[in-house]
């Protein structure tokens, strides 16, 4: 059950009621981001496990330790983390379950730490209503304060740029490294706003990758061929192997519309 928003003071009492109602449904866990909400869940429904959301942006073992001490059983680490850092967290907290994102959209900021959507559209990312303003086409201007002139910067005549647009994460080719690390307990695939076709294909591809790894016949090309049939904005392995700022291929400045080699034509 997801409760990973960041509530205002005026919503605390409603949140308490919400947690009680959710607990009655006996979910496997609450996915929470805010430290105060973690504590509230522990007080109201101590029988429900707490999984820390990727929105909490955990990148190191110090932050992980804080949440472990609060009673968090599993951390979905930040999308921006490297496998080396995941292994370091596991080394310091061997009993903490670690879940990583392996596939799906990426934020151009640390996950959800962006107010562009809130400022332009009144829709706040960390409150579950991001309008994906980073996917819009923007036009750049250069100004001259002395003369008061403004010049439009163009890569092509009349064409703007998708300067904030991130590619999609795709770590299927790195499943062997991830599982070899012994530090990861669960793999997470983004499903929000995705089609049933997308969910089915991605889940199938990663299930095959995991099973093939344990069977000793890991074939990255096979999984990638299947994954490229889904809608995507171009793929990147993000920061799993490379730390932030060491990679330059995580942005797609050419287009924001998701493209795939297959189109769904009907449901059977």
Predicted region positions:
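N-terminal active-site wall of soluble small-molecule enzyme domains
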Residues: 6-25, 29-66
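Surface-exposed amphipathic alpha-helical tracts and adjacent flexible/coil segments at the periphery
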Residues: 1, 13, 19-23, 32, ...
